[in-house]
Amino acid sequence: MDSHPFGDQRVALKFHEFSDGRKTEHYVKCFANGFSTSVICHEASYGGKKGLYELMLQYHGQPTSADEITAPGDTICGWLTKEEVLEKLERVEKLPPKPKDKLVHEFLNGLVSDQNGFYGEM
């Protein structure tokens, strides 16, 4: 079975189904550089009602941002056409791995955020 260009297809959650019966889509793609993407199109996704896609960027399973993929400080970009998703996937594949000091900061930042119940800076 051929893989979808967006990645491996995942089962979408029932509450994300389109009210008009359209098929909900969810794909996950992992890259050798440690990045991964989750691409969705459903009733509540950014652009989903118009048939457009939302992409979330992750690094070793943690949401992250990267220039030319997401807006600064944002981990999600929406309202993407199929062609725009494919362009972003090509860019993600070419990203260099993150330096370890940045990973430690993001990890610690996540711990503080989780303990305080919000997602802010340390």
Language model features with spans:
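Amphipathic, interaction-prone secondary-structure segments
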Residues: 13-56
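Mixed-charge, Lys/Arg-enriched low-complexity segments
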Residues: 2-8, 57-122
